[in-house]
């Protein structure tokens, strides 16, 4: 296992906006992130929170253009280029949207993918190394991380079955081979070990209602514990 600088890990902290929260969802294809994000959004709005749902890459005009260019490309992108493209989109999302919106009290931002996807995709699956990814992000605003990350974990077999059931066209990353997707799981598992206080691992193979209740409990623990 790659040795990660512990002092570097300590540089990654959530933004400080009393009464507002930044939450991310992670997982491989077929984990059901989108379904759970939508349900959690409805739940939080019922609790009178102002909820914004963002995605990575994306969330800004610049980020959405990068997303389209990356996911629709028919040529291989160099791993270093991938890494910096995602970091670029993330920096813009943070400055243009996240930090401004969190300044409004009672706001919750939910982001579909964030830093841990870069750790999994470029750090592990593309073999750039996690240390390099973290060093790239050790600068404002990229060192800012969510208050809580929900990692909806499924195995490769479950992912492939669910993708087959959806029968959707595959994008740049979805079309990679099985070994790539197994490395993604390894990458997310490693991220969970590196940031255990931030990342909550939820078993995504269960019934969607059971998964939802587990996630809701994690969200409640974050929000209402912090309010106390």
Task: Cite the ranges covered by each PLM segment.
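A glycine- and Lys/Arg-enriched "phosphate-lid" helix/loop adjacent to the NTP-binding pocket
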Residues: 118-186
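Hydrophobic anchor at the beta1->P-loop junction of P-loop NTPases
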Residues: 25
